[in-house]
Amino acid sequence: MTGTSFYTSVLRLGRLAQQGLKFQSVKHIRPSCFSSFGLQAKRWNSTQQNDSSIDCLEPKLQGIIEDNISPSTAQKEISDIKFNIPKEMLLPDGTPDYLRLTLTSNVYEVIKETPLTKGVVISESTGVPVYLKREDLTPVFSFKIRGAHNKMASLDKQSLKNGVIACSAGNHAQGVAYSARTLGVKATIVMPQNTPEIKWRNVKRLGANVLLHGANFDIAKAECARLAKEQNLEVIHPFDDPYVIAGQGTIGLEILHQIDLRKLDAIYCAVGGGGLIAGIATYVKRIAPHVKVIGVETFDADALKKSLKDKKRVTLKEVGLFADGTAVKLVGEETFRLVSKNIDDVVLVDKDEICAAIKDVFLDTRSVVEPSGAMAVAGMKRYVAKHKPKNPNAAQVCILSGANMDFDRLRFIAERADLGLNKEVFLSVTIPERPGSFEALHNIITPRSITEFSYRYDNDDYANIYTSFVVKDRATELPLILQQISEQNMVAEDISDNELAKTHARYLIGGKSSVSKERLYRLDFPERPGALCKFLRSIKEVCSISLFHYRNCGGDIASVLAGLRVFDGQVEKLHSVLEEIGYNWVDETNNPVYLRYLRK
């Protein structure tokens, strides 16, 4: 399908207007919709509905606006939700006509069309052309402003007289606040009391009245409903509303004219309540049904996946909060009705894959998206790896849905990104407690870059070591490494997928020890190949290692903590050796923290 045939759908709106149909704010359809592909049409807005110049081209897409759905058949699928939508915006079966609602959406009062950019680095790593839809570049750094503003702009002055209200601690809150300020409407946002200050301050900065209420989201939501009824406020739902869905659908509208439809294979969307994917899928499947629309959820927040399997909405007992923008226990009623008919698949991803996707996006754009904002990229990578596209030149489009990242999450993401890329391996290794074992293990791992090394003396027979290092290809390199370790009479276990090890145990390795003649040193290691090997070889004549902790933090210098069992009368000799090595060092043997927590 060409871009020209796509835009004929817009021209049909003009014909329908001549037939007496009224559209809300048709003036907001951009002139580019008529002229970008050289179509000969005049500007048209709500004051020019009788302009005969609109009917200038014969549409090539028959039935793109008029649905030939049998009312008796479709009536079975009608949602119980009652929406206040003009009759001319309904299909014969009484459900919303999302093509018309999307084409007449009021989103361009508050945003510009967001770019669709080639992800060069991601394309190279996946072997397929990948494009990024930059919803992180809207005024509130997420797509949510589209649906929120479209809903509010559809309301009349009487409905907006007392103001609007929403319950949200995330991107929807900012979208409502920004739109309310633009429209000159009073907005109240209800958030749980434990909402981080950075989030509620951002909403307040946009002019909304922020009410912190309740210990959790359910209590805040109940308070929102109470206030709406008591003060006669208009509730702006985050996803389960036709105007919100249609507003998000304008992303699909933009994508279809930003890329050659003949080369477009699939669009990937993060899924929470379903508003984003419902809007995009419903529009795209009407215009370009050959394009796949694929949802992406996390393994611990997969309400849509389970609902599609059971063919009814399923409520999750608990949801993971890492990708908080999609942490929804129950998808919307209207969104589920639409999604169940219009999407092709749902793929699940984990935390490490999301962290890797955030890094991928950063390498391509130098922007840091939030976890839910990177889910589409993570899902695309998993889907393409499992289902190789028949045409390797077919484009994959990922929606970067948001970039409202909490700064304190960056450390966790940086630590887990390489695991998600399968570029880092975590091992638990048991080695014999004898001279040279530590160095032998190090020599097996090198010249690979070691990212962490933790060891604490426990007994005279064996030692347990926790280590991580970078590999080029985990699948091919790891079996060889494990074999080499086994040949040294050591036992190794791959714990790269062990959540307890990655999140907690790595920081608790060791504990108190009563090992004799131990001294503690803190050293600065240069981050270069051979630095650790140089240290081990230099000290082996004067001491043995009883504690060692190293963690690569991404800088030029790494901080190392080493417990050394110094041979009799060799303390001064050890200090001379440390000076000769040239690394900065501090003797921490009398540090009260060491004496209290690491010594028996």
Swiss-Prot record:
The EC number(s) attached to this protein equal 4.3.1.19
Transmembrane regions listed in the UniProt entry: none
Give an example GO molecular function: threonine deaminase activity
Per the database record, which ranges form the ACT-like domain?
425-497, 519-590
Any GO BP annotation: isoleucine biosynthetic process
Offer one Pfam family short name for this entry: PALP
Q: Does the keyword Amino-acid biosynthesis apply?
A: yes
Q: What is its main location?
A: mitochondrion
Summarize the subunit comment.
Homotetramer.
What this protein is called in its record is: Threonine dehydratase, mitochondrial
**Organism placement in taxonomy:** Eukaryota, Fungi, Dikarya, Ascomycota, Taphrinomycotina
